[in-house]
Swiss-Prot record:
Catalysed reactions, semicolon-separated: D-glyceraldehyde 3-phosphate = dihydroxyacetone phosphate
Active site location: H95 (electrophile), E165 (proton acceptor)
Sorted UniProt keywords: Gluconeogenesis, Glycolysis, Isomerase
Binding residues annotated for substrate, in chain numbering: N10, K12
Cellular component GO terms, alphabetical: cytosol
SUPFAM superfamilies in the cross-refs: Triosephosphate isomerase (TIM)
Pathway annotation from the record: Carbohydrate biosynthesis; gluconeogenesis; Carbohydrate degradation; glycolysis; D-glyceraldehyde 3-phosphate from glycerone phosphate: step 1/1
Complex formation: Homodimer.
Lineage of source species: Eukaryota, Fungi, Dikarya, Ascomycota, Saccharomycotina
This protein's name: Triosephosphate isomerase
Xref: HAMAP family: TIM_B
Presence of the UniProt keyword Isomerase in the record: yes
Highest rank taxon of the organism: Eukaryota
A single GO molecular function term of this UniProt record: triose-phosphate isomerase activity
Length: 248
């Protein structure tokens, strides 16, 4: 099954009005293949700024997080309805930095994922192992556990993109080899086929999210189960366009 190549750009807690304008303007003027979907995730305070600047139908805007309640006394949180209200269509959930620094458990991520999907946004669901877990050779057990928590709450995966992000590679400059990533992605797809169906598994896009950049993105070009990238630091730089075009 042909899956549309997907590039996500997670700006994290970086950027200003000026720098985000520069990034969006660069995308507005870039050559983007028609068969590529691009989603950028600026900080929440700049979501409507990015939406207003964006001129490309291939480019959508995402939040980096959302709470699992519609409204209420949850100081500092953003609801899915608020995210939709400013024009964003996606949300990143389960990112390792949320799991690590903000103590988000598999259960919390699953609840957020179900609530976001039920509320009408699409989800980039992040999973991945730490260095310690990698050294213990339990990568597959970890990602399957993380997926299983969501599978218990979400049956329809039409609007879910999975991002495999080896935590040991994020922001370190280290990266899994294309071959290693392909092996993990294939195992993830087989797990989804077992738990859902072959058709669903073959339709779900699985991204690589560990220090992808303009130089190493092309090495993943012929990997059948690598359907794109969730890019961190490189999404703030001109090389983000190179990553978008890495399958051309």
């Amino acid at each position: 099954m042909a899956r549309t190549f997907f590039i996500g750009g997670n700006f994290k807690m970086n950027g200003s009005k000026a720098s985000i304008k520069e990034i969006v303007d660069r995308l507005n003027g870039a050559s983007i293949p028609s068969n590529v979907e691009v989603v950028i995730a600026p900080p929440a305070i700049y979501l409507d700024h990015a939406v207003a600047l964006n001129k490309r139908k291939e480019v959508k805007i995402s939040a980096q997080n959302a709470y699992s309640k519609a409204s209420g006394a949850y100081t500092g949180e953003n609801s899915v309805e608020q995210i939709k209200d400013v024009g964003a269509e996606w949300v990143i959930l389960g990112h390792s930095e949320r799991r690590t620094y903000f103590n988000e458990t598999d259960e919390i991520v699953a609840e957020k994922t179900k609530f976001a999907l039920d509320s009408g946004v699409k989800v980039i669901l992040c999973i991945g192992e730490t260095l310690e877990e990698k050294q213990q050779n339990i990568t597959l057990q970890v990602v399957q556990r993380q997926l299983q928590a969501v599978l218990e709450k979400v049956q329809d995966w039409t609007n879910v993109v999975v991002a495999y992000e080896p935590v040991w590679a994020i922001g370190t400059g280290l990266a899994a080899t294309a071959e290693d990533a392909q092996d993990i992605h294939h195992s993830i797809r087989e797990f989804l086929a077992e738990k859902l169906s072959r058709d669903v598994a073959d339709s779900v896009r699985i991204l690589y999210g560990g220090s992808a950049n303009g130089k190493n993105a092309v090495t993943f070009k012929d990997k059948a189960d690598v359907d794109g990238f969730l890019v961190g630091g490189a999404s703030l730089k001109p090389e983000f366009v190179d990553i978008i075009n890495s399958r051309v």
